Amino acid sequence: MEEIITPLKRAFADTFAMYLKTQYYHWNVEGPDFYQYHELFGTIYEEVYGAVDPFAEQIRAQLAYAPGSFKRLSELTRIVDEETVPTALAMAERLLADNTLVLMSVKEARDAADKYGENGLVNFLEDRLDNHKKHAWFLRSAIKRV
């Protein structure tokens, strides 16, 4: 059912893109707060990575194929690719913005699943929303200027 599959694939692509960007930042962060950002980005990318395979399996459970090529994922995602190495603070700010996009796409997929009574999928997506709300909290706290 395309009404579920289309937003589900977008949410998957946004999740995968956020995972890649977060790991990229984890590898390349520098500066006086290196360790704190390195650990924060590591915590986030590990959690998001853990969702990639179950997300793909949810797409397969809908009798669709999970997107797997970088070309297709880049067509689906709203997250902008990173080609530079920004400051640690800018990394956290960009991840917060990207996480907001993931929250939006997961909510859209959840709403579609709910509309069609796909309760198991709704539960999975609600769990994803909870995790991304926690990531938003961590990132907001890391960039807050006291």
Where are these regions (language model features)?
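Helix-loop segments that flank and shape redox-cofactor active sites
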Residues: 1-3, 18-43, 105-120
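Generic structural signal for well-ordered, non-transmembrane alpha-helical segments
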Residues: 9, 13-16, 42, 46-53, ...
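Conserved alpha-helical segments that form or flank metal/cofactor-binding pockets of metalloenzymes
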Residues: 33-72, 142
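Short, contiguous alpha-helical
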Residues: 123-146
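Disorder-to-helix initiation segments
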Residues: 1-11, 81, 88
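Acidic/histidine-rich alpha-helical segments that form the ligand environment
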Residues: 53, 57, 76-126
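Non-transmembrane, amphipathic alpha-helical segments
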Residues: 3, 7, 40, 91-94, ...
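Heptad-repeat coiled-coil alpha-helices
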Residues: 24, 28-31, 61, 68, ...
